[in-house]
């Protein structure tokens, strides 16, 4: 009976939110005001750290300040990071489902423990550029929501962090040079990629990576360009690749029951907010990718978002051979590994939705 009720709520949610996810849909402008009505309080738990630009430049301005300002005080929001709530990120589906948060955000890799198909949106090597990553994200949003709705939640935005790249303690000139090295990874598809390169994947929590690199516990590590700079990795690494191996895509989700209780004008107001945030977050992900590299290599004139490294690194330019190897590993190792973990249905979803956009098909 409970499952039936959740499906009913999910169907109603689909009708209310679906316009947010249609590829190519013109973005609605956020309404400048709301008519008088009952006050709405919104609790949001979003980025891992309160210092991240996604939090300071998007979440706080929109989900706290602008909601109140543009709604004439009818909507009031509080925003906290995972760290401020002592969360790892894996709890977000359950947190939103239980109503402890109305809006939650986390990386798809983190959320995939509950919904395995989420891994397929951001497989290692799948999207060489951020434009492809966004087209895949837009197309997969309604697909993954069919699984998420079983939990009474629904994604309304998928957005990127800066490109995930390789930082190393010692020089390297190509992906092939990583053979034999110990590489910190996260998520199943990056483990598959690093293993296929002949390197040894090592799972280490992000806060511990700096000391692991410093002490030589790992030789290299994968993270976002800007994330590595923010964590002071240039102090303990010398070379950084500019080849995106993934995008650490993340998503904002809402509680379906909570959403359906809102008045139509409030839902419309929030839809406009999410649409505006989506554009800002994709623009930020694009700008922050190059900015992170420039800050890491000491290019002060173009380091605008992150902090300039005091110990400039060497940028390792991607080669055609690197790109070809990454695509080959995606086709032969990463994609089959994903389908094996997720099931045949995920392979069918991949071929039907992602393959036409990425040019890679499961099963050839």
Residue ranges and their predicted role:
Residues 11-25:
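Bacterial N-terminal signal peptides
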Residues 128-147:
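A gly/proline- and charged-residue-enriched helix-loop-helix capping module
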């Amino acid at each position: 009976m409970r499952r039936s009720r959740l499906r009913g709520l999910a169907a109603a949610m689909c009708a209310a939110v679906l316009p947010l996810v249609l590829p190519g849909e013109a973005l609605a402008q956020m309404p400048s005001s709301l008519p008088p009505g009952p006050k709405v309080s919104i609790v949001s738990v979003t980025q891992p750290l309160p210092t991240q630009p996604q939090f300071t430049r998007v979440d706080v301005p929109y989900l706290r300040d602008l909601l109140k300002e543009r709604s004439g005080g009818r909507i009031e929001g509080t925003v906290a990071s995972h760290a401020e709530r002592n969360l790892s990120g894996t709890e977000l589906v359950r947190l939103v489902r239980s109503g402890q948060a109305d809006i939650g955000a986390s990386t798809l890799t983190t959320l995939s423990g509950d919904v395995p198909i989420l891994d397929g949106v951001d497989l290692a090597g799948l999207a060489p550029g951020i434009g492809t990553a966004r087209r895949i994200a837009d197309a997969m949003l309604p697909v993954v929501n069919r699984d998420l709705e079983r939990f009474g939640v629904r994604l309304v935005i998928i957005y990127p962090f800066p490109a995930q790249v390789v930082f190393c303690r010692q020089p390297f000139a190509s992906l092939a040079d990583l053979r034999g090295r110990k590489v910190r990874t996260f998520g199943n598809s990056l483990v598959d990629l690093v293993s296929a390169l002949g390197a040894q994947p090592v799972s280490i929590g992000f806060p511990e990576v700096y000391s692991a690199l410093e002490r030589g516990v790992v030789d290299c590590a994968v993270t976002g360009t800007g994330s590595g700079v923010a964590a002071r990795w240039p102090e303990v690494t010398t070379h950084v690749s500019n080849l995106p191996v993934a995008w650490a895509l993340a998503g904002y989700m809402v509680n379906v029951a909570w959403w359906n209780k809102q008045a139509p004008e409030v839902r419309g107001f929030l839809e406009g907010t999410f649409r505006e945030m989506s554009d800002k977050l994709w623009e930020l992900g694009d700008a922050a990718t190059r900015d992170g590299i420039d800050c890491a290599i000491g290019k002060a004139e173009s380091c605008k978002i992150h902090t300039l490294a005091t110990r400039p690194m060497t940028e390792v330019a991607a080669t055609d051979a690197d790109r070809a190897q990454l695509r080959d590993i995606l086709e032969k190792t990463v994609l089959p590994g994903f389908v094996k973990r997720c099931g045949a249905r995920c392979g069918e979803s991949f071929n039907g939705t992602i393959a036409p956009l990425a040019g890679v098909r499961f099963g050839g």
